[in-house]
Amino acid sequence: MLLLYEYDIFWAFLIISSLIPILAFFLSGVLAPISKGPEKFSSYESGIEPIGDAWLQFRIRYYMFALVFVVFDVETVFLYPWSMSFDVLGVSVFIEAFIFVLILIVGLVYAWRKGALEWS
C-alpha cells in the first residue's frame, strides 16, 4: 500500500505536463483572431515582399549534407554521456562504444565513396 503513494508525484507531473500544452492549444484556438485575407496566403521573407515565385526546388545535395550532419550530431549525443562516465562503466562499454564509432566511420566512408559528400 505504501508503494502506491510513491507514484503520486509522477502521476501529478504527468497530468500537469499533459494539460498545459492542451490548454495552450485550446486557448490559442479560441482567442486567436480569424482573418482570411491576401496577407495570410503570401509568404513572409524577413519583412520583404517576395519577388517572383516563392516555391524553389532545393538540390538533393543539401539533404545529403543535412543527413550526414544529423548522423554525427546524434553520435555526439550518445558519446558525450559515455565519455563522462567512462571510468565507472568499464571495458565492456568501451568496446561497445568503439564498435558504435566503427559503424559510423564505415557509414562515412560509404557516403564518401558514393559521392554523397561531393558538392559539384
Curated annotation (Swiss-Prot):
Alphabetically sorted, this entry's keywords are: Chloroplast, Membrane, NAD, NADP, Plastid, Plastoquinone, Quinone, Thylakoid, Translocase, Transmembrane, Transmembrane helix, Transport
The organism's superkingdom is given as Eukaryota
Query: What is the predominant subcellular site recorded for this chain?
Result: plastid
Q: Name one GO biological process term.
A: photosynthesis, light reaction
Give the catalysed reaction(s), semicolon-separated.
Answer: a plastoquinone + NADH + (n+1) H(+)(in) = a plastoquinol + NAD(+) + n H(+)(out); a plastoquinone + NADPH + (n+1) H(+)(in) = a plastoquinol + NADP(+) + n H(+)(out)
InterPro entries this protein is in? NAD(P)H_OxRDtase_bac/plastid, NADH_UbQ/plastoQ_OxRdtase_su3, NDAH_ubi_oxred_su3_sf
Q: Does the keyword Hydrolase apply?
A: no
Q: Record's Gene Ontology CC terms? A: chloroplast thylakoid membrane; NADH dehydrogenase complex
Which spans are transmembrane here?
9-29, 62-82, 88-108
UniProt EC number: 7.1.1.-
Q: Where in the cell is it found?
A: Plastid, Chloroplast thylakoid membrane
| Disulphide bonds in the chain | none
Tell me, what is one Gene Ontology molecular-function annotation carried by this entry?
NADH dehydrogenase (ubiquinone) activity
Topology of this chain in the membrane: Multi-pass membrane protein
Functional summary from the UniProt entry: NDH shuttles electrons from NAD(P)H:plastoquinone, via FMN and iron-sulfur (Fe-S) centers, to quinones in the photosynthetic chain and possibly in a chloroplast respiratory chain. The immediate electron acceptor for the enzyme in this species is believed to be plastoquinone. Couples the redox reaction to proton translocation, and thus conserves the redox energy in a proton gradient.
Assembly and binders? NDH is composed of at least 16 different subunits, 5 of which are encoded in the nucleus.
Regarding protein family, the annotation reads: Belongs to the complex I subunit 3 family.
Protein name per Swiss-Prot or TrEMBL? NAD(P)H-quinone oxidoreductase subunit 3, chloroplastic
Q: What organism does the record attribute this protein to?
A: Trachelium caeruleum
This chain is encoded by the gene named ndhC
